[in-house]
Every structure is written in C-alpha cells, then in structure tokens.
Amino acid sequence: MYTKYEQTAHYIRQFITERTPEFSIILGSGLSPLQDEVTPIMEIPYAGIPNFPQSTVEGHGNKLIYGTLSGKYVLLMSGRFHYYEGYPMDAVTFPIRIFHLLGIKKLIVSNASGGVNPNFSVGDIMLIRDHINLFPEHPLRGRNLEKFGTRFPDMSQAYDCQMIDLAETIAMEQGTPLQKGVYVGLQGPTFETPSEYGMVRAIGGDAVGMSTVPEVIVARHQGMRVFALSIISDLGGKDISPNVSHTEVLNAVNATMPKVLALVREFVKRSK
C-alpha cells in the first residue's frame, strides 16, 4: 500500500511548481464556493491521479486545486470520499496520506451536519472540538504503517486548541456567532431517524454527519494539525421529525457561506 501512496505523491508533486502548501483543505457538501477564493496555480482532476478514488456526491467536485489563499499556499480538495459510497477506509482517507507525503502540516476540514444540540439553529457554524467515532470500520485497522505513525496514536487533542482559539477570536472580530461542540460520525447514507438523533445527543454529541472523523484520525496518526468546522444544515432530535433532503442541506450551506468564507480567509491569513 505504501508504494501506491508514494506513486500518487510523486505524480502530484510535479504540479506543485512553487512552495509546498502550508494547508490542505477538504471541502464538504455545498462548500465548493470556497474554491473560488483560491488563486489557482494548477488544477489536477482526480481522474488523472494514479490510485485516486472519484467522488460521486452532489455538491462535491473531483479535483485538487493548488494555489494561494490569503497569501498562503494551499492544496484544496474539491470533493471528498465517503464510506457510504462503498469505499473502504483506506480509500476514504487516501488523500490524507498523500498530503503528509507532500510535506503539508495543517489540515482544514469542513462539512455540513445535522444539529442535535437544542441551542443550535440551522445555518450555525460549529467549530469541532472533539468527535465520537461510530463508523463500523476504523481507518487504522490492519497492519500499521510505521512510516506514518505509531500503532496506538493519542487522540486526546485531535482538534488543535490554538487553531480553535484563533477562529473564535476572528469570529468575534467579524461579529459572527459560533458554536463549538462534539461531532459524531456515522456511516450513512440515510439521514438519521429521530431516535438516532436522540441517541447522538444522549452520548454527548452536538452534531452528526457522515464524514470527517476518518480523515481526522488519519491526519492525527501522522502528526498533522487539524482544524474542522461544521455548518449546521438541519436539526433533529427524538421529538423532531426533520424530513431532511440533500437539497435542503445544500441550501442551508449556501445561506451561511459568506460568513464561512470570511472566517476561513482570515483564519488562513493569521494561522501560524
């Protein structure tokens, strides 16, 4: 498997014609407008990258964008891979391994998620401070690749506290209300039942979604700093029947997008 990682990294490296990116950024459902904030140097379609999967979900692109954002070099992933698409975990997290081999030290992850905290509203931005992994397969299951990290990585600070503090400071300056909470990862593809939403809340979750957790686990396994945010695209609970659709999720994300863009632009600019 490591040979495949090296082969893919070697292919992508030829397109990184200037400085090594400081950030890798993964765009979630409906968050494609963020790619318009990047001044592109090179676009790399997934279809041409050796060993790379393809995203099949509406609202997700299928390319890497190497360029600059707020004066920093970034490698942006327009379209992620989900466990519910039928991919094994090593495919879902394949790009994260490549980011590490390219020398990228920081990861920004975004998603749209369902809110279960009664204090949340549709359109809220939630900074992820921790997660609960309820995926049926662990991304580090199997033989450990020592070149990436230890067999038993620590996850007590999966999400970088300094990055969270910076985002909170910026949001306060911009007048953007933020939530902060625990993201629960489920495999999907069905949206949760009211009872499942209730379970998520009962075990300590504030929001629930179908991505992010595997990517973060692998990023931390190899020592990357991680910052993650969710847009609350719908609400659910044991006494709420949300009747949510993917179109409604995308609409909620679009309405919040200007605030997200402003936050991410300044975050990248000021991050150290």
Label the predicted regions.
Residues H100-G103, R201, R220:
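Non-catalytic positions within long, well-ordered alpha-helices that form the structural scaffold/packing
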Residues Y11, F15-E18, Q162, L166-P177, ...:
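Generic non-transmembrane alpha-helical segments
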Residues G236-K272:
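His/Asp/Glu-rich mid-to-C-terminal helical/loop segments that flank catalytic regions of hydrolases
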Residues M210-E248:
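Zn-dependent metallopeptidase/amidohydrolase metal-coordination segment
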Residues I164, I170-D206, V264:
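Active-site/ligand-binding-proximal alpha/beta "capping" segment
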Residues M1-M155:
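Metabolite-binding pocket within alpha/beta catalytic cores that recognizes anionic/polar moieties
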Residues K105-K106, D206, R225:
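Short acidic/polar active-site loop segments enriched in Thr and Asp
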